[in-house]
């Protein structure tokens, strides 16, 4: 029996077959979760339906998380399908491309700062607030972060700030929602080739360096992220909350490596 048998999980952020959220969906489906998907663009709903046709799911919704009223409407509609559920996977982020290709200080603006934090961090808090009364005991909220939240990663720039905000969100949300027996965690993933990651200047170099200095000398896969997300949404992780879990083949541990 799968570790998510009987669990209802909401997954956001699938864009295409390269999306980390798609890897998470496949892992959770293997573990027998019941799934609903949320996408951010109405134009790609049919494309996503085709992509996930091999995955048994309830339905797919659209939500523009930059508007609180849309988030309220999303959970109003979800309640028509699920009165209660057990988990939310937040795989949503956005940063203007310019911020990942030019000098951080010179290219940063109030507008880019606000939209990057609003979509990448605040949306997690807003979704949690709207759905908390629908969540079963020991439900799990999971989001995705990256090393650039804590360390300098070339060209990650404004997204690094937003991921720092997101990780702080995880801690404070875990504290606030703990009294409701709701757990909140983040997975800090190694670099994976996705449509979004290719917006980062010199991403291929970043990925090569990651493989060279990871402890196992391997790239991270979306399946590996999916397996950890499935664990975090299962009862096997019932004692884990407020944590940032690194899934990067140990890259985050490295200082001056003997390979030099």
UniProtKB/Swiss-Prot annotation:
Entry superkingdom: Bacteria
Keyword NAD: yes
Recorded catalytic activity of this chain's protein: a 2,3-saturated acyl-[ACP] + NAD(+) = a (2E)-enoyl-[ACP] + NADH + H(+)
Residues marked Involved in acyl-ACP binding (site): 201, 204-205
Oligomeric form and interacting partners: Homotetramer.
Keywords of the record: Biotin biosynthesis, Fatty acid biosynthesis, Fatty acid metabolism, Lipid biosynthesis, Lipid metabolism, NAD, Oxidoreductase
Name this polypeptide is given: Enoyl-[acyl-carrier-protein] reductase [NADH] FabI
General function of this protein: Catalyzes the reduction of a carbon-carbon double bond in an enoyl moiety that is covalently linked to an acyl carrier protein (ACP). Involved in the elongation cycle of fatty acid which are used in the lipid metabolism and in the biotin biosynthesis.
UniProt-listed InterPro entries: Enoyl-ACP_Rdtase_NADH, NAD(P)-bd_dom_sf, SDR_fam
UniProt EC number: 1.3.1.9
Pfam families, sorted: adh_short_C2 (PF13561)
């Amino acid at each position: 029996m799968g570790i998510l048998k009987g669990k209802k999980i909401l997954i956001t952020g699938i864009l295409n077959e390269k999306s980390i959220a798609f890897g998470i969906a496949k892992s959770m489906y293997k573990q027998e979760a019941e799934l609903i998907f949320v996408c951010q663009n109405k134009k790609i709903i049919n494309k996503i339906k085709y992509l996930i046709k091999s995955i048994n799911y309830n339905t797919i919704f659209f939500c523009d998380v930059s508007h609180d009223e849309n988030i309220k409407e999303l959970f109003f509609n979800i309640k028509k399908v699920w009165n209660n559920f057990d988990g939310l996977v937040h795989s949503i982020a956005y940063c203007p491309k310019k911020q990942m290709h030019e000098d951080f200080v010179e290219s940063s603006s109030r507008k880019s700062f606000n939209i990057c934090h609003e979509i990448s961090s605040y949306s997690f808090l807003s979704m949690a607030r709207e759905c908390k009364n629908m969540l079963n005991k020991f439900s799990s909220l999971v989001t995705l972060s990256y090393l650039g939240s804590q360390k300098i990663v070339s060209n990650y720039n404004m997204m690094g700030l937003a991921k720092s905000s997101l990780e702080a969100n995880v801690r404070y949300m875990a504290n606030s929602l703990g009294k409701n027996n709701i757990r909140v965690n983040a997975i800090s993933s190694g670099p994976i080739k996705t449509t979004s990651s290719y917006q980062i200047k010199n991403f291929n170099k970043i990925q090569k360096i990651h493989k060279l200095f990871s402890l196992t000398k391997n790239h991270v896969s979306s399946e590996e992220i999916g397996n950890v997300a499935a664990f975090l949404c299962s009862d096997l992780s019932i004692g884990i909350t407020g944590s940032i879990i690194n899934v990067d083949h140990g890259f985050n541990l490295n200082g001056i490596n003997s390979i030099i």
